[in-house]
Every structure is written in C-alpha cells, then in structure tokens.
Swiss-Prot record:
Lineage, uppermost ranks: Bacteria, Pseudomonadati, Pseudomonadota, Gammaproteobacteria, Moraxellales
Cystine pairings recorded for this chain: none
Organism, scientific name: Acinetobacter baumannii (strain SDF)
Domain of life: Bacteria
SUPFAM superfamilies linked: Restriction endonuclease-like
Protein name stated in the entry: UPF0102 protein ABSDF1354
Amino acid sequence: MVVAQQLGQWAEQTALKLLKEQNYEWVASNYHSRRGEVDLIVKRGNELIFVEVKARGQGNYGQACEMVTLSKQKKIIKTAMRFLQRYPSYQDFYCRFDVICFDFPQKIAKTVQQDFSKFHYDLQWIENAFTLD
C-alpha cells in the first residue's frame, strides 16, 4: 500500500504542476468533508475546477479513469457543494469537474522508493468529465 500512496502523491503533485503550466491557480489540495474528498481545487478566471487524480500501474485491472465510478462522482460533487457552502466567495464561479489520469504500462516494484517520473506513462486529462446532472 505504501507504493500506492507514493504513486498517488506523485500523481497529485504532477497534475498540479500541469494545471499551473496551463495558468490555473491552486486553491486547495485534498479537501475533505464528511461526504468525501477532492484531490485538487484550482481556479482560472471565474472558473473553479474540482479535479480527481488517478494513477494505476500495470497489473491493476482497468485504466485509471475507469476508477472514477458514478458513486465516486457523487461523493466529489457533494464535497464540492460543501466547499462552496464553506467558502461563499466562490459561489458565483462556474464549476467544472475534471479527471486527470496516469496509466503506467509497466509493473511498478512494491518494495522500492520510486521516482515515478522516470517511468513511461500515459496521461489523460478529461475536462468536464462529469456534471451535476
């Protein structure tokens, strides 16, 4: 599980770097409510983007983006709504839900501290991945 946590932290840091390169401003990381968690919250102009980040290595079933189930989407939406209640200055922003996924085609050793950036990976950024509907 330690490697999975390291991979998740690396993926969130890398996703945030990518977002900043696209002129998004960091608002929050790992925002928790009793309903769930949002990995990253960023803004650009009057857009507020709630970002779910997923990473998977070979040997895991399915691709990273497939892990953002309908149940997970509902939890993210409820957590986002709680964020907006807690921080009313963002209530007039246009809200969007994105998913950023990292898929590693190779197996990742479970016992070694990894620099995941040295591995080849496929990156998928899905803007408006899901909506409030």
